[in-house]
Design a protein with these regions (language model features):
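Non-catalytic connector elements of ABC transporters
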Residues: 40-42, 50-159
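Internal alpha/beta loop-helix hairpins
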Residues: 1-61
């Protein structure tokens, strides 16, 4: 992604998105482009409310996302969240997009730990936690914690 100011992504011989590398990665227009450019967690969801600045997804996860789109209540969307945008902790912090999870898998890489965590409803999230000094001890297999992410970091896809 450092070789060009604009990149084109093709799917089955069709050009599906042309944009700057940062835009392709941070705000892909489709789940294909999002998945093509690296690890990402997807959540199939139904819009519970939308006010042109945010979308709330109901159900067991109750996720809030920033969005410029005016999506009708009840419409199906796919939410996408990059692993580096998700924070894992042992405790609640009282913010939006705070979901209880259990650690299913982890891989310590030295500079970071890659986690695969699961909600009570079975939704999986992949995240990468940077190593830093913290009062929170790292979570291990089978332990319960909370994922946290900002609404601005949730990508809303209509495909």
């Amino acid at each position: 992604m450092t070789l060009a100011g604009r990149i084109g992504i093709m799917d089955a011989g069709q050009l599906v998105q042309v944009d700057a590398p940062r835009s392709l990665y941070e705000r892909p227009k489709s789940s294909f482009v999002a998945d093509f450019l690296g690890t990402i967690s997807f959540v199939d969801a139904i819009v519970a409310s939308c006010d042109k600045t945010s979308i709330t997804i109901g159900g067991d996860l109750n996720i809030c996302a920033a969005s410029d789109d005016d999506l009708p209540v009840g419409s199906a969307v796919k939410l996408a969240i990059r692993p580096e945008k998700i924070y894992l902790s042992r405790t609640k912090n009282g913010g939006v997009n705070e979901i209880e999870v259990v650690v299913e898998d982890l891989a310590y890489l030295g500079f970071a730990t890659n986690y695969r965590v699961k909600t009570a409803s079975g939704q999986m999230f992949k995240l990468q936690q940077q190593q830093r000094r913290s009062l929170d001890a790292p979570l291990s297999w089978g332990e319960t914690g909370y994922v946290h992410f900002d609404p601005q970091d949730v990508i809303v896809l209509k495909d």
